Amino acid sequence: MSELLKLHHLRPAPGSNKAKIRKGRGEASKGKTAGRGTKGTKARSTVPAGFEGGQMPLIRRIPKLKGFSNAKFKTVYQVVNLDKLSKLYPEGGEVTIEDLVAKGAVRKNQPVKVLGTGEISVPVRVSANAFSSSAKEKILAAGGSVTEI
């Protein structure tokens, strides 16, 4: 029977462990210039971040922006026009955001604003987050009602 497999007999497979190359340690392989060539910026340290070869860097070409903007606090509404409502509800009735989501007119979890483009002839009871003044006038003129949530 051959020698039993023992922990102290285990050796790595040939060629699996390569010796680490120690650059810049003596005149032998990768010594002196350590594979960087001679002189110049790249031979010394790294090229500075943002350096563009002498042309004016992007960070200095663009003006400094000052001040404060309320843009990130702006409410962005999903828009539904009256002509869309008249197509979705030809017989009139109750119009809620949940109904509009179910019919695929709007997405859920975003506020809805009804705008006055188009005409509506049947009375509808619309509840939404916001209405334009023309949409309110046209819905009320058709005999419907408007509820802001």
From Swiss-Prot:
Signal peptide: none annotated. It comes from the Bacteria. PROSITE patterns: RIBOSOMAL_L15 (PS00475). GO terms for molecular function: rRNA binding; structural constituent of ribosome. Keywords: Ribonucleoprotein, Ribosomal protein, RNA-binding, rRNA-binding. GO terms for biological process: translation. The keyword rRNA-binding applies. GO terms for cellular component: cytosolic large ribosomal subunit. Residues 1-52 are annotated as: Disordered. Transmembrane segments: none annotated. InterPro entries: Ribosomal_uL15, Ribosomal_uL15/eL18, Ribosomal_uL15/eL18_sf, Ribosomal_uL15_bac-type, Ribosomal_uL15_CS. Binds to the 23S rRNA. Part of the 50S ribosomal subunit. HAMAP family: Ribosomal_uL15. Belongs to the universal ribosomal protein uL15 family. This is Large ribosomal subunit protein uL15. It comes from Thermobifida fusca (strain YX). The lineage of its organism: Bacteria, Bacillati, Actinomycetota, Actinomycetes, Streptosporangiales.
